[in-house]
């Protein structure tokens, strides 16, 4: 009922039902299977809103955190709007509140709410860097160095490196290190790849061709 009301915008929306009498288990299963062919799955955004309506803690915490940065979760790209809601949930559920908080802080501080900066691959790329390097990753240096290039250039470099969010993590790490020659001042690309892949399990990269960039 909550989901129907949420999607339709009204609690007075009629819901069509059919009642079957004296069904055997096999017939019931067959009816259910056939009905699922015509069921439109809810989008991640609709599921997120339904969880908010249900008062679930994870989604309430995520919403409040996003709001605290002057951002919002939505379905259409716009400045300061995060459309990659399932990515935000995955980061929170796997890495916790403080990591998600830092990811958002770096993202907004680096690109100042650019609508292209909240893609799944960029959010996951930042998450990878934070997970691997922790406090070795200097937030102010990140914002200065990585923020010096456009999202368009970042996307281009990432695609040249490799597919998915690891390409973005590599591209951001290259910009972060800049021309530093002292190994003690550089973050190691080898370390980024040396960590067990299990640390990144649960982070789903975007496969949408237009997800990364909107603009000329």
Label every PLM stretch briefly.
Residues 2-216:
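Accessory terminal alpha-helical modules
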């Amino acid at each position: 009922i909550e989901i129907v009301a949420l999607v339709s915008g009204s609690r007075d929306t009629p819901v069509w039902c059919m009642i079957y009498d004296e069904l055997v288990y096999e017939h019931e299963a067959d009816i259910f299977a056939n009905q699922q062919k015509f069921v439109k799955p809810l989008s991640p955004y609709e599921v997120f809103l339904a969880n908010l309506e249900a008062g679930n803690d994870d989604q309430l915490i995520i919403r409040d955190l996003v709001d605290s940065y002057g951002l919002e979760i939505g379905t259409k790209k716009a400045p300061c709007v995060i459309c990659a809601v399932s990515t935000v949930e995955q980061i929170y559920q796997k890495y916790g509140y403080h990591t998600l908080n830092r990811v958002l802080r770096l993202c907004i501080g680096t690109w100042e709410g650019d609508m292209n900066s909240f893609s799944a691959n960029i959010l996951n790329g930042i998450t990878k860097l934070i997970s691997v390097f922790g406090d070795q990753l200097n937030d102010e240096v990140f914002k200065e160095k990585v923020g010096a290039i456009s999202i368009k250039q970042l996307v281009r470099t990432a695609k040249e490196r490799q597919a998915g969010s690891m390409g973005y993590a590599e591209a951001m790490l290259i910009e972060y290190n800049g021309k530093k020659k002292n190994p003690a001042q550089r973050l190691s690309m080898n370390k980024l790849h040396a960590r067990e892949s299990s640390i990144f399990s649960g982070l789903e990269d975007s496969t949408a061709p237009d997800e990364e960039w909107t603009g000329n």
